Every structure is written in C-alpha cells, then in structure tokens.
Amino acid sequence: MKRPGIYLFALFYVLTLLSCANVEKYNRFIETPLAVEAMQQDINYVEHNLWKMHPDLFLYIGEDQLKTKFDSLRSTMRQPLLPNQFQLALAAVLSQVRQGHMTLSPLISKFDPKGKDKVRYQKSKGPFSQLGFHWQENTLYLSKNGTADSTLIVGSKILAIEGIQPQNLYTKYRPTFTSDGYNTTFIDRAFERLLPRYYQLELGYRDSIAVVFSRADSTYERVVVRRFEAPEQKGKVGTSHADTEKPNKKPLEKKDKPIEKKSDTKKQRKIFGYNANLKRMSKQLSFPVKGDSSIALLKVADFSYGRPKEAYRRIFDRLELNSVQYLILDLRGNLGGRLSDVRELYSYLVEADKFQFVQPAVITSKFKLPFYQIKGLPGWSYPVLSPFIIPSAVVSWTKTFSKDGTNYTHLTGSKIEKSKANRYRGDLFVLIDGGTFSAASLIATNLKVGKRAVFFGEETGGAASGTVAGVLPVLKLPNSHLRWRFGLMDVKPYYHVNEAGRGVMPDISIVRNVDDVVKGKDPVLDQVLKIIKRQ
C-alpha cells in the first residue's frame, strides 16, 4: 500500500472511533439535566437574535405580548430540565410568532451500528417508514401499508403504538409547531408528517413496534418490524457448472439494452427530480382522461428536486405538442422549495408578456445579512470558508437597498422578466390543500389574485400574503444544543394581499375525507374533470 493510502486508512479509522465516541457523548447529553442558569442563557440568546434578525417579528403578535411570554418563560425555569423538556417550553413560546418556517428541533437519540450492520441498517426500512398515516378529527388512521403483512388493513384506526396513544402525542407536541398566521389546515398535515419523530422521541430507536388497530368495532394488534434488504446471492442453489457457463454473443446483446434503458431512466430522474424515499418524481405530467390528450395533469410535489429549467421546458413543449386546452396544476402537499424553481414554472403560466414573481424582500440589516446567513456554521469553518464568504458577501451587498427607512434585498423573481414564448395559454385549474406551503403558496397567490386560474380543494397552509423565509440559518443554542431555524427575509408575492394570516382560498371547497384517502379516491380532481367535461 502506498503512503497516501496508509494515511487515508488511518484517518478513516480515527474518524470512525471519534464518531462512535461522539454518538455516545451525544446520547448521554440528551439524558443530562440542564442547569437553570444554562436555560436562562439560552432563552436570552434566542430572544436577542430574534429581535435583531427577524424581519417581521410582530406581524401576528404584539411586541409587548411576546416580551411578556419570554419573561414568563424565564420565571418558570426554577429547576433543571432535560434538553427536550426545555425544548417543549421554549418551542411553545416561539410558535406564538406564528411563522411556519421557524422551528426549534428536539434532540433525537442516535444509533450507530458497527461493521457490516452499519451497511445493513443503511439499506433497511424502519417500522415507521413502512406505514402511512392520516390524521383527521383527532383520530389517526393507517393510510398506507408498506409491510409484508397483508392483514394490516388500510383505513384502520391506530389506537396506540407501544402503548402510547397518538392523541396524547398531539396534546404534548401541538404547541411546539405552527402554520403561517391563523391558518389551521396545515396543522393536521404537519402532525402526520412529524408523527414518527415524536414516537422516536418517546420510545428511542426501535427495530419493531407493537401497534393496536381498530376496524369495524374489532381491535387487533400487529408487530411491525424493520425490513432488511435480502442479501445478494452469487449463484442459485443447485445450478450446475454447465448452466453457469454460457458465454455466447446473444446474452451480451441483451445486456446492452437494459444498460441503455437504465442510463436513460437515471437521466429522467435527475431532470424531473426523483425522490428515492418517497419513490416519486418532483414534477410529473400525465393525462388523466384516457384517449383525451387535451386535458393534462401536472403534479408538482415540491420545488426542491430536479432540474427545473429542463424539466419545465420538456413539460410545456409536450403540452404544446398535444394542443392541451385544460391544464390541472396539482400543488397539494407541496411544501415549497427553491424560489428559482417556482419562478420558472410561473414563467410558463402567466398570460402577460412580462412578469414579476415576488417583491424585493424586507431584511433587518443590509450589511449584516450575509453574516447572518452563515451564523449557524461551526466556528472552525470560518477560516476554511472565508475565500467563499467574502465574495458572497460582496454579491449580497450589491442586491440590497433602502427605501423609506426599510432595508430590502432583491431575490430571484423580484425584477421584471420576460415570460416564456411557449407558455401555456389555455384554461388553468389549481388543486391546493393544507400541505401547500411556502413557495407553493407564493405561486398560488399570484395565480389567484392575477385571476389566471380557478382553485379547488382547501385553504393553503402557507399564508397568501407571504412568508418569512428566503434564507434559513440553523443556530445551535449554546447550552441546550437545540437547533433553531428561522427566516431572514420577508418574502411577499408580487400581488398584494390585504388580509394577513390566512392562506389562499379555493374557489370551490372540497376536502378529502379519510374514506377518500384510504380508497385512493380523489374527489377534488374528479370535480375538476366534471367541470371540464361540461365545458
């Protein structure tokens, strides 16, 4: 082995040992009570940075009211608490700001398998990831069964997991998260998404969970276990030596085709943003009515994955080729993502030759903004990243300006741009729900107020008037080590909305109930198709 190889091996070995030690240290810290003074310092740290860095802190709560809540929290810190007990108290105060992007994450215990087990666990599926959940009217339902157990009936009520009722978790953790403003449709979708995390906080790392179900007045219990990937077999048992040796040209030709197909599939996944965990594309075009290519459905699951310029170009070229007259844009469950992605989509939907997607964002400080953006990074990284930080700061300063005593910065889409030449000009229908959030709400607002589309579903989880996001640093609290994320920019859609704190409202309100979810029915899409058929 050459010297560089020896050094790399030694470095890898040392890092592995340090990683194991760090995991043990981290898990011990979670179970170590924090001193009262340490918690007081963390509260002061949060309060100071919140007042200094948040661009629209008092939109939904008065300054005196928020100050009183922090003072009250400090006064209740009279005895040591575990970090996650402290998180519950502090997060409940932060949620009163009513900004959905702001989160204070609890510390979740880590599991660090060794050797071959590490690879096995990385390729495995935990018990919670095999199940789908639907939370409605204070009841938890099984919406997906990804296990090998066919006796798990989708649509069953989940009464308890390892003896813990989901209603108790909702009561405990509901005060720690919020939507934008006074919206409530986001809450149920957020809870069912966060549910596995809450159970892990209560139970720790589990390879199996006992679940009590209720179905048609009967109760049954099942154990859901971690599913490991089957080990690869080098050769089939009982295969003769003669069978394994058949080197001729025809099998080689057959092997070439799947390789080409695999390569093409890989490219498609990169362009349209394949999410391996959810097994879906970020952007997917389909034609919901068999034999009718004039009606198209564009499902945009997020604005985070894929190559939007190439993806939307291909999609809208296809719409033009098929002479699509009715386009249904499905934004349900879209939690947002990159501003550049959603702006690109909007440029294909707007009717005018020119457009502006968002207004310049309000910020607290022109000079300090680039340094706020990196505030959550560890101290040792600053010298390493300084060659990149300084040029980035200069670019950031060139985008900022002041007007009437308020500081602003330009964003992607905050200047007037040309619409796409092959933009869609037909009828547009948009599907929304409580999971339509952040950037997805921005485009929904512009399409709604701009009278470009008809909306179906339920009120969006994100506020129609905008959101505080843009750049979201994650700060580590000095003593509790809790991770605190919040936005630095007040991002508003181009079209002004007077009422703050409510989402984009549907023109036709339709809510999917649990039976629809379980049976795979989509009454929202069905209603749109009925209206199109009448036209």
Would you name each region that the model predicts?
Residues 1-27, 46:
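Bacterial Sec-dependent N-terminal signal peptides
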Residues 20-327, 331-361, 464-477, 483, ...:
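Flexible, low-complexity junctional segments that flank or bridge functional domains
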Residues 65-66, 70-76, 378-405, 419, ...:
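Extracytoplasmic/peripheral linker and loop segments enriched in polar/acidic and small residues
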Residues 174-179, 325-410, 448:
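Glycine- and acidic-residue-enriched helix-capping/beta->alpha junction motif
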Residues 323-328, 423-429:
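Short, surface-exposed connector motifs at secondary-structure boundaries
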